[in-house]
């Protein structure tokens, strides 16, 4: 096969992957956008030609300005070594200003909240299409309860399958979504040819006319429904690392054309002869021939499942990045698939399932879900715009240029936020409340880390080198282990956390041949795996600094094995011959890892607010995974110790001896 043929093969494969991974959310929008718009106006009987021209024009220009220009053309350039998404962007610009962590946390929390609502609204809307199938109505009737049960069954099965990975079935996502977009385009085009005049909506004049028209019953609030057409744009940016910007940019024109054909086709059908339908209908299913409705429902359900899968996988990635950026507590993470970056977080998975299921039961219908959908994601988009401004300034774009560009998009997004704010009382409070809860967890965790760092001052290993050497040779002290490893969250040269030396010398003197001090630094690059080592001119003290990307698994034990071999190969660490071993020629001694847990003492000198933050952080920590599991030490020798979180600031309590 020639190089050109190989390139074309890989390019086609990349485009198919992009279809299956990136466009699930935005690709299911035609299921409910036009329905939400006409429902807000009062139903089919309340719309006319001017209204539909304005509505489709708003959809077209929203997709063009926000999805195409902001995300596809601009945001995809703000990649962190190929990775996208709000936390990858934050990792890229966080050194510019401390306050940038606030929009990152708000945006990330809102995106996670959106991840719970998307499966509910997309799957429910798809299944509700069964009402247009006569055979289904004859068998089960038109009861919404049956729709809810089917929806809950599909959602539950989807979340149950997450623990097994999506390697095999994931290969089908691309072809299925390619077929879905083609179906959208063809079905829309068939109806569009009945009334080409709807193409006048390409003129933004009609969009403006609708916004100011007295015939528009909801005024600017119509933008809350229009915005649903572009909610998947943020997911598009978040999935950059899975497919690459080139594949997204090459596949987006086809996807956009198919989406627009569906929207324009639905509008043409609504304005067509004989469509004076009373009440609320879904034009997406209603415009199809009756013989295709069942096939369309199956196709739409598959697309909704794929869209939900993308949001679930994206939520796993988002939380994983937040953990490594120390914005979220450590959660148990497994890697069921062979693909790079594929992960499974049980707490996130079942938490999403619980919230999604409750949303389906609470809202009952897709119409009510649509009324609540989109509010949270407008916040994420606005926060992403804020971080893009910092990125553009970092790239030396002049202040005026960066301000005008991001200010333009921020203005649009603020307008959409105001329009979507009306959704708060119609169910939007659920998404906002969930986002607020996630944000508070992030804020408490981040602030708690800051407080501990501010109050715990490091100590120099060189200053205590003589004591450590003496302890090493002191035969009156029982040997703790050949190699003892301390994981320290803070290390600068020979400076380590005070609690580490306190553990070795004060709490329980630990005699060992070699003392290891290991620190993990999370880099802004996603897949870094490097280390530095310093023996401090001794044969018994070793400081190791691991530099791991924010998407790299922190499997400390396995990394340490590699480092030990490297040190022995270069003569910096003496061989530790073993008398007893089932491994022939083993020259590495036994290891024990010491993990030091921190507790808050009653006497700590903290303000009430800081104390509340620390207490809340420690409470949250109880539900997080253990450090041993997080650092891959489940099968290693591990000792767990407890020290006061701020033990160097606890004053002695006065007490007087009673005279006899």
Curated annotation (Swiss-Prot):
GO molecular function: potassium ion transmembrane transporter activity; symporter activity
Transmembrane segments: 14-34, 56-76, 99-119, 139-159, 173-193, 208-228, 257-277, 286-306, 343-363, 372-392, 399-419, 424-444
The protein, known as: Probable potassium transport system protein Kup 1
InterPro entries linked: K+_transporter (IPR003855), K_trans_C (IPR053952), K_trans_N (IPR053951), Kup (IPR023051)
Keyword Cell membrane: yes
Membrane association type: Multi-pass membrane protein
Organism: Lactiplantibacillus plantarum (strain ATCC BAA-793 / NCIMB 8826 / WCFS1)
Signal peptide interval: none
Localization of this protein: Cell membrane
């Amino acid at each position: 096969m020639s190089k050109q043929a190989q390139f074309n093969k890989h390019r086609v494969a990349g485009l198919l992957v992009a279809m299956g991974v990136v466009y699930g959310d935005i690709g299911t929008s035609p299921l409910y956008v036009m329905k939400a718009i006409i429902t807000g106006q009062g139903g089919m009987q309340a719309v006319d030609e001017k209204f539909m021209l304005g509505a489709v024009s708003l959809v077209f220009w929203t997709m063009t300005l926000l999805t195409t220009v902001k995300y596809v053309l601009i945001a995809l350039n703000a990649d962190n070594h190929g990775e996208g998404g709000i936390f990858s962007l934050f990792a890229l610009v966080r050194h510019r200003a401390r306050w940038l962590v606030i929009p990152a946390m708000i945006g990330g929390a809102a995106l996670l909240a959106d991840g719970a609502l998307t499966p509910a609204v997309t799957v429910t809307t798809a299944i509700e299409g069964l009402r247009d199938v006569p055979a289904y109505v004859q068998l089960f009737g038109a009861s919404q309860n049956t729709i809810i049960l089917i929806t809950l069954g599909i959602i539950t099965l989807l979340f149950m399958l997450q623990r097994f990975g999506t390697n095999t079935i994931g290969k089908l996502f691309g072809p299925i979504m390619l077929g879905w977009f083609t179906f959208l385009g063809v079905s829309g085009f068939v109806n569009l040819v009945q009334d080409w005049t709807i193409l006048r909506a390409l003129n933004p004049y009609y969009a403006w006319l609708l916004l100011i028209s007295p015939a528009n019953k909801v005024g600017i609030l119509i933008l809350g429904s229009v915005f649903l057409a572009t909610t998947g744009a943020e997911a598009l940016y978040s999935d950059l690392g899975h497919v690459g910007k080139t594949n997204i940019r090459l596949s987006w024109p086809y996807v956009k054309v198919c989406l627009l054909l569906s929207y324009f086709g639905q509008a043409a059908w609504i304005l067509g002869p004989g469509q004076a339908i009373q009440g609320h209908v879904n034009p997406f299913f209603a415009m199809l021939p009756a013989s295709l409705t069942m096939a369309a429902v199956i196709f739409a359900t598959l697309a909704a499942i794929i869209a939900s899968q993308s949001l679930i996988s994206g939520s796993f990635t988002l939380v994983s990045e937040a953990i490594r950026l120390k914005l979220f507590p450590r959660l148990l993470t497994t890697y069921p698939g062979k693909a790079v970056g594929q992960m499974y977080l049980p707490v996130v998975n079942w938490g999403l399932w619980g919230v999604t299921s409750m949303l389906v039961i609470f809202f009952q219908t897709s119409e009510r879900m649509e009324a609540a959908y989109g509010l949270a994601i407008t916040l994420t988009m606005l926060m992403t715009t804020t971080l893009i401004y910092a990125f553009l300034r970092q790239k030396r774009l002049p202040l005026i240029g960066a301000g005008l560009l991001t200010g333009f998009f921020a203005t649009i997004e603020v307008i959409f936020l105001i329009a979507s704010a009306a959704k708060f009382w119609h169910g939007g409070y659920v998404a906002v409340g969930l986002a607020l809860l996630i944000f508070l967890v992030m804020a408490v965790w981040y602030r708690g880390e800051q407080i501990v760092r501010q109050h715990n001052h490091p100590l120099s290993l060189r200053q205590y080198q003589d004591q450590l050497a003496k302890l090493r040779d002191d035969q009156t002290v029982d040997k703790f282990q050949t190699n003892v490893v301390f994981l320290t969250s803070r290390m600068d040269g020979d400076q380590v956390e005070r609690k580490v030396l306190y553990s070795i010398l004060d709490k329980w003197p630990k005699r060992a041949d070699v003392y290891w001090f290991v620190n993990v630094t999370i880099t802004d690059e996603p897949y870094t795996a490097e280390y530095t080592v310093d023996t401090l001119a001794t044969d018994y003290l070793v400081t190791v600094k691991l530099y791991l990307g924010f998407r790299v698994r922190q499997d400390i034990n396995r990394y340490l094995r590699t480092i030990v071999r490297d040190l022995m190969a270069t003569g910096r660490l003496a061989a530790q011959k073993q008398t007893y071993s089932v491994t022939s020629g083993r020259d590495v001694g036994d290891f024990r890892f010491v993990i030091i847990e921190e507790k808050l003492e009653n006497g700590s000198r903290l303000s009430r607010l800081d104390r509340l933050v620390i207490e809340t952080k420690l409470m949250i920590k109880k539900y997080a995974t253990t450090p041993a599991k997080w650092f891959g030490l489940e099968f290693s020798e591990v000792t767990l110790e407890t020290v006061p979180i701020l033990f160097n600031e606890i004053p002695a309590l006065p007490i007087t001896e009673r005279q006899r």
